[in-house]
Amino acid sequence: MKALILVGGFGTRLRPLTLSFPKPLVDFANKPMILHQIEALKEVGVTEVVLAINYRPEVMLNFLKDFEDKLGITITCSQETEPLGTAGPLALARDKLVDGSGEPFFVLNSDVISEYPFAELIKFHKSHGGEATIMVTKVDEPSKYGVVVMEEVTGMVEKFVEKPKIFVGNKINAGIYLLNPSVLDRIELKPTSIEKEVFPRIASDAKLFALVLPGFWMDVGQPRDYITGLRLYLDSLRKRSTNRLATGAHIVGNVLVHESAKIGEGCLIGPDVAIGPGCVVEDGVRLSRCTVMRGVHIKKHACISNSIIGWHSTVGQWARIENMTILGEDVHVGDEVYTNGGVVLPHKEIKSSILKPEIVM
């Protein structure tokens, strides 16, 4: 089987992290976001992954080359010269996706984190005999989204309603699809939306089906959702693979610590924390609801919450970082500095407190 991952463009919503790496290579729970998807695809027999990309393809391919060998999976790029929306990239990559076997192929949005129930998706797709299957997820406030109206028993999609003012359902597109090659005949090589143009046409022919996604789902393309997504991911990990989570008197709730990280005495870590490879956390540090990426050094008695600390940054003694502060790569926060939210671009030194959210350039 094959898969296409819609990587997209510049990752502006997740800056400053995407100033250092393309968004799919930004760490999530101690590994690049896109690697979560590729590993799950490999488990259900996908042998080739095509990355639909219009930004820095050489960085992506160079980085993923090692994982190609480790996973035994082929990773190639299909590069857009102009933005093609969410359907145009399928037409562009047609020759890479169609091999004459008639097998369906996956299409994923690269921002989506879930438990990736691909085996269930394949089984459902083959059972209904339609042309395309989309995964949907339930939301509390459907009026903010495009809602998928479907038959509860068969899963056949009846229509899509954009930001409904009256209740028509609570299921939205989860950005995970399994499509027959015939879907490509419906797509022209031009900027096109698969959600607003292609899927409604397939639904009108009664050939589009939806499967409700079990477990959690989150689009982690912006910082606040990234932090929420980490909490949901760690909750799921506790249910599926408890032995991967950290334990000890200094751990509170769900915490993921890379084996090469070093944590000092008297720390309190958690809940909902990921600490990456090569990190050093000195004595008396308090961490909660945050991600600490590869190579970060956190000095004594610092306190970090609701924040993302970019690669190879340093947080000084008694510093306090909170309220959705996002540090880019190689940022140095001084001793006793307080940051109350905001974005700090890579390679900056913060010597004085940031009392209200701002961008430090």
UniProtKB/Swiss-Prot annotation:
Gene3D superfamilies: Hexapeptide repeat proteins, Spore Coat Polysaccharide Biosynthesis Protein SpsA, Chain A. One of its GO terms (cellular component) is cytoplasm. It holds the Pfam family NTP_transferase. InterPro entries: GMPPB_C, GMPPB_N, Hexapep_transf_CS, Mannose-1P_guanyltransferase, NTP_transferase_dom, Nucleotide-diphossugar_trans. The keyword Magnesium does not apply. The keyword Membrane does not apply. Its EC number is 2.7.7.13. SUPFAM superfamilies: Nucleotide-diphospho-sugar transferases (SSF53448). Diphosphate binds at residues 9, 11-13, 23. GDP-alpha-D-mannose binds at residues 6-7, 85, 109, 111, 146, 173. It catalyses: alpha-D-mannose 1-phosphate + GTP + H(+) = GDP-alpha-D-mannose + diphosphate. Keywords: GTP-binding, Nucleotide-binding, Nucleotidyltransferase, Transferase. GO terms for biological process: GDP-mannose biosynthetic process; protein glycosylation. Pathway: Nucleotide-sugar biosynthesis; GDP-alpha-D-mannose biosynthesis; GDP-alpha-D-mannose from alpha-D-mannose 1-phosphate (GTP route): step 1/1. GO terms for molecular function: GTP binding; mannose-1-phosphate guanylyltransferase (GTP) activity. PANTHER family: SUGAR-1-PHOSPHATE GUANYL TRANSFERASE (PTHR22572). Belongs to the transferase hexapeptide repeat family. Catalyzes a reaction of the Smirnoff-Wheeler pathway, the major route to ascorbate biosynthesis in plants. This is Probable mannose-1-phosphate guanylyltransferase 2.
